[in-house]
Amino acid sequence: MKDTIVLYPNIGRGHLVSMVELGKLILTHHPSLSITILILTPSTTPSTTTFACDSNAQYIATVTATIPAITFHHVPLATLPSNTPSLPPHLVSLELARHSTQNVAVAFQTLAKASNLKAIIIDLLNFNDPKTLTQNLNKNIHTYFYYTSGASTLALLLHYPTIHETLTKNYVKDQPLQIQIPGLRANITTDDFAKDSKDPSNYSSQAFLKIAETMRGSFGIIINTFEAIEEELIRALSEDGTVPPLFCIGPVISAPYGEDDKGCLSWLDSQPSQSVVLLCFGSMGSFSRTQLKEIAVGLEKSEQRFLWVVRAELDCADSVDEQPSLDELMPGGFLERTKEKGLVVRDWAPQVQILSHDSVGGFVTHCGWNSVLEAVCEGVPMAAWPLYAEQRVNRVIMVEDMKVALAVNEDKAGFVSATELGDRVRELMESDKGKEIRQRTFKMKISAAEAMAEGGTSRVALDKLAKLWKES
C-alpha cells in the first residue's frame, strides 16, 4: 500500500487547477507517493452556479483519463442556509466549504482506512479548523495549508490580526491606512484591500481573522511562489517565530488543457513576433456591456494587435440560453474594423499556450496569481487590472516590487476608461518603460526555471516536504 497524500482544493476553478498541478508535481519527483484529491461535488443550486461545475467536471475527467496516478474522491457539497448574506464569489466558496465540514471529516476517515495516509494539504479557503476535520485520525497525519497566491498576500493574511486591531481603532470610511509589515516594500494601503474586507466589523474581516489563526496552527504552509520573486518577504516570514515552516515550491502553473476550437493559436501564427497583447480575465472575470464597449474603444485607440477573451456578465443576457452575440456586445462595426489586427473570442481560450506563443508581447490580466505566474514563466510583461479578492494587492506587488507590470487604473466605481486602457496597452507594447518591464520579466522567467530545476530552491523545498511525509 503506497503512502498517500490527500489534497483538498477549494471549488473555485483556479484553486482546483493549482492543486491538481501540485499533485502532478509531487508525483513527478516522488512517484512512490500516491495522490488523492478530495472534490466537493456541487449541486446546481444558485449559490454554486458561479463556479462552473460543468467545466470543473470536464477538467477532472481529463485529468483522470491522462494521469491515472491521481485519483479523485467526491464528497457531497453542502447547501448554504437561506439566511446566508450576499457575498462575493471567493467568500461564497469559503462558506460552502465551511458548511461541508462534516462531510469532509467523514471522507478523511474513509480515506485513512483505505490507504496509508501520510498528510493532508488543505486550500486556504477551506480554512476549517484541521482539528475538527482530522479529530478521528492518527495524530501522525499532519495537516498543511496550500496557499495558491504569493508570499506577499500570505504575509498580509498572517498579520491580519494586527492589521484588524489597527483598523478597529482607526477605521474611517474612505480614509485609507498605510499597511506596514516586516519584509513588505510595496506601498500598500487599505484602499488596495477588497471592498468587503476594509471594514473590520464585516463578515470578510472576521473570516480572515479565523483563517490567519488556523493557518498559524498548521504543521506547515506550502506556497505557490519561488524565493527569487519575493525574497525579502519570504525571509521575513521564515524568521517570524510564530509562523509555521514555509515551503515555497512554485511556480506551480497549469499544464496546457482544452482544445483551441476558436483558432487562437493559428491566428497567432500569422502575427509578427511579440506584437499581440492578450486580454484575459480568469474564469470569474466578467464585465458589463458598458465596460466591454469601453474596452473595445480603448483597444481600437491603442492601435495594437490584440487577442481578447470576452466574458459578459449574466445580466447582459436575456436568458441563460440566449447569450448576446459579440456584435451586440461590441460598439457598432468594431469587429469588422479590427479584423486585420484583432481576434475576439467568447468565454475561454488556451491561455497557457497563448502566453507561450512567440507572437504575444503583452498581457492585460486580472492579477490572479496563477495568471501572473504563467506570464512570468513565459517572460510576458503585464498590464495589471484587478477585479476581486486579493488582486488589488497583487497589482501593487507586480508594479512596485516585482516590476513586471504597469498599473491599469480604475475610478472609484471600478470602471476603466477607454483612454486609460488604450494608453496602458500602448505604453506596455511600445514605450521604453514597457521594454524595461519586458527585460525584467524575462530575467524572472530564468529565475523561475532555475528554482524548479534539480538543486533549485523550489525543488529542495519539495524534497524536504516529501522526506517529512515518508518519515512520519
From Swiss-Prot:
Top EC class of this enzyme: transferase
SUPFAM superfamilies on file: UDP-Glycosyltransferase/glycogen phosphorylase (SSF53756)
Gene3D superfamilies: Glycogen Phosphorylase B
GO molecular function, one term: UDP-glucosyltransferase activity
Signal peptide: none
Source superkingdom: Eukaryota
Record-listed E.C. numbers: 2.4.1.-
UniProt-annotated binding residues for UDP-alpha-D-glucose: 283, 348-349, 366-374, 388-391
Keyword terms, alphabetized: Glycosyltransferase, Transferase
InterPro entries registered for this protein in UniProt: UDP-glycosyltransf_plant, UDP_glucos_trans, UDP_glycos_trans_CS
Presence of keyword Transferase: yes
CDD domains: GT1_Gtf-like
Function: Glycosyltransferase that possesses isoflavonoids 4'-O- and 7-O-glucosyltransferase activities. Shows a successive glucosylation toward the acceptors producing their corresponding 4',7-O-diglucosides. Can use genistein, formononetin, daidzein, liquiritigenin and naringenin as substrates. Also shows a 3'-O-glucosylation activity in vitro.
Homology family: Belongs to the UDP-glycosyltransferase family.
Protein name (Swiss-Prot/TrEMBL): UDP-glycosyltransferase 2
Gene: UGT2
